[in-house]
Every structure is written in C-alpha cells, then in structure tokens.
Amino acid sequence: PDGMPPSEAMEALCESAAGAGGHAYQSYVGLPEVRKAFADWYARWYGVTLDPAKEIQPLVGSKEAILLISLAFLDKGDKVLVPDPGYPTYSSASKLVEAEILTYDLCEDKGWWPDFDALEEMDLSGVKIMWTNYPNMPTGAAASEELYAKLVDFGRRHGIMICNDNPYSFILNDDPLSILAQPGAKDCCLELNSLSKAHNMAGWRIGMVAADADVISEILKVKSQMDSGMFKPLQLAAVQALSQDPEWFAELNAEYRRRRVL
C-alpha cells in the first residue's frame, strides 16, 4: 500500500503522542478500546461475534502471529500443512520450531483452492496446524462460504487447527468474509487480520488474532515474553481506523481498480 491512512487515525496518533501518559509501557493484551474496536469491526463487516476481553489479541502487525502461533502450538517433529504457492513465512516459522512441513498444492484448475480429495489421501497423523490465506497471496484467489465451510469441516474431523491469514479481505472486494463466521469455527480455527492493506497502514504494524479464549491465552503466554506492549498512540489510532465507513473502502478500491486498468 502506498496511499495515506485515514486522517482520523493520524490525528489520534499525534494527539496521543503529544499528551501525557502515552509513552509508558503498555499492557500485553492491548487497550480495552482497541480490543473493542476490533470486535466491533468483526461484527460490522464479517458478522462475527467476538468477546473483546478474551477472543482478540492485538499484535505488532499480524506477521508476528505466525511465529507466536508456531511457538505456542508446535513441538519439534510436529507436522504443518503449508500452501504452495504461499507466503514464505509460514514455512520459515515452522522451520524455526523444527516442525515438519507438508506442502499442499494450490492449482489453477481448482481455483487456487486446496484439493480436499488430495488432502484426505495424505498421512495427516501428527499434523497440528494448517495455514490458509484467503484472499490468497500470491494468486489473488478469493474465499467463499463454501471454501471456509470445507476448511472448518476438515479441521474438525482431523483435529487440525486451521490458521487463516486474512489481511486482504477488503482489497478489490465488496463482500469481506471471515472463516470465523462459519458454525463451529472457533472449535478449530483462528484468524489473523491487519490494518496494513485495508487501511494503508503497513508501516504502523497493527494487527490482531481472533480465536477461542483458550487459544488466545496460549498465544499470549509467548507474546508476553517477546515484547512489552504496543505504543499507546498506535492503539488509539487503530480505534479510529477501524471505525471507517464504507466510503473509505470504496475509495481505496476505486483507486486500485483504476491502476489495474492501466
């Protein structure tokens, strides 16, 4: 993203940074205001109800969650399903914790979706995590209710945690979807999200993970040993960014559509 963030976010950042109390250590779990803003955002755009106190963890960008999740839920020798093609960090983080990587192909003739028949034929013993990323990078393939329902069913039947990386859901898309909107998804799924793409705030490093409270608790055990909380002015800026009206996304996507034609 090379556009400007929402003006309200920049104003909130500057106001908080100039005031007293904005430069101290912050809580690992994030401000109540930012957790509520993420919960409201999910309810408004994805139709997903989340407990802001227990089912949301703000992050220094969603990328850090890939390593946090790997450290929290993988032991040496555990297996991880990683898409090919896919975001390299899924494999890199798995290697750091000495997990065994099992790649699954995303093919054009399947719409760049997983081939569930092929997955069922794999030896899935010892598989703890499956990384998914829709809308997909690098293929651009979109998600659908059908795809997410299949992923939830696959994860529940095989005892695999489906980790859906969802930072592109607003880009060139008027109907953002979340895997957590599927019935029973919290039993086996978590989702990463971010302000980087949808709000032109990539350098600000503001993201989140949403999941069942027990999953969030395990992630927090690792995160609390890796940083000392997010800068308060950034969190207050995120609250403003997350409250943007549909016009913000319409203008953002109009610009991307204009560039795509060129």
Q: Where would I find each of the regions flagged by the language model?
A:
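N-terminal small-domain helix-loop-helix segment of the aminotransferase-like
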Residues: P1-G61, L68, A241-Q244
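PLP-dependent aminotransferase class I/II
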Residues: M4-S7, C188-L262
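Short acidic capping loops at alpha-helix termini that bridge into adjacent secondary structure
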Residues: T49-I56, K76-K79, G126, K186-C189
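Conserved PLP-anchoring active-site segment centered on the Schiff-base-forming lysine
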Residues: A72-S94
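A short helix->loop->beta-strand "cap" motif at the edges of active sites that frequently abuts
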Residues: D78, A99, F154-M161, A185-D187
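A short helix-loop-beta submotif of the ANL/AMP-binding
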Residues: L96-L102
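Active-site phosphate-binding strand-loop segment of PLP-dependent enzymes
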Residues: L102, L106-L177
